């Protein structure tokens, strides 16, 4: 099945993934990252890490909580076109113009563009709910869309 949304004859087999499914996918990803990162920072900094007022407690904090998640997300996007959360909902990231796999440059740009989406009161994330193609600002800046196959459920009921 081709991922090409504009030229492939099966482009109608895909739908844009909306706000709430993407929130669910993000929650799955957040829990997975928390399960990995929280024990690591606790191992390095001890339980006092969780009561500190410091934004960043040291180089290991940056590596574990900022760099490791960025690398993990970009690697998943590169090889699977989705994080585990998006995989769980059957979604994947594709180039907005061709429907094909996005370039590594697009994916890195998409990750960095999340900060643009998040900083102004999460407005760029909420934008997904109102955009006709269900693109957040990070998708628009990177030239990507999130899609999944239509008719994901069981066969229709027949009598």
Can you say where each PLM-predicted feature lies in the sequence?
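Short, small/hydrophobic-residue-rich motifs at membrane-helix boundaries and re-entrant hairpins
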Residues: 1-122, 136, 140-143, 147-159
